[in-house]
């Protein structure tokens, strides 16, 4: 998901509602950000499972607050400067989805990045481990409708008589296939709420560990064996076009290593033996 212009404008306002510093001497203040790339304009972070991309409630502490503290501690911004502009993130991942979150240190960079996400001028790729065998890659289309009461979405192949149904497109390529699971590289073409999770579940291949859209019995088996409590879905790659909109970003690829538990489960399933270069690349080192 990307943020609207109204959201971007919010970060330039002076308000305690916008930024409340992370309280020092607490467990939360000990979080160390995993910085994938940064320069004077932008920063790309590898968000861990369990962390909010942005606040859901006023009392929450999200990646945005940790980002501000990081910039303050490293001397890249002052509290006086925060009175006129707040650096922020411009895309959002589900709380229990790990991976790349892009941030802007300047208003101009934040606006440009947000526009690139909105217009899909950059490519977003995910890794996920799904139930069942998928032998061939495919580009699938459908319509997604969100139930705000349950915070859950449903996907159908055909558009039904409702204005709320939004068109979605998801493209996937199998990187490794076993008897019971498939490691997929997913190109997120549109970027709707829970799109990858719901779309894959709709075609009979839910993501392992996804209790909202997945198979409860399978998830419980992985929980018992590995302690897995969240979906094995990771935003691992951003590919920028050859356009000089933001300095240093043309043709740049940002890659985020997968979490240790994700990596362990994949290795146990034989991904390493299969010689999956895409997974080795995303893992951060040769397995």
Regions inferred by a protein language model and the residue ranges of each:
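Long C-terminal interaction/binding lobes of large macromolecular proteins
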Residues: 172
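Pseudouridine synthase
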Residues: 60-67, 176-240, 262, 285
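Short, solvent-exposed loop/beta-turn-alpha elements that line the ligand-binding surface or hinge
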Residues: 155
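Short, solvent-exposed loop/turn segments that connect beta-strands within catalytic domains
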Residues: 9, 244-250
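Acidic/polar residues at beta-strand termini and the immediately following turn/coil
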Residues: 147, 242-244
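Residues that recognize and position ribonucleotide moieties
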Residues: 91, 138, 142, 165, ...
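A glycine-biased structural micro-motif
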Residues: 249-252, 256, 268
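RNA pseudouridine synthases
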Residues: 1-152, 161-169, 177, 258-268, ...
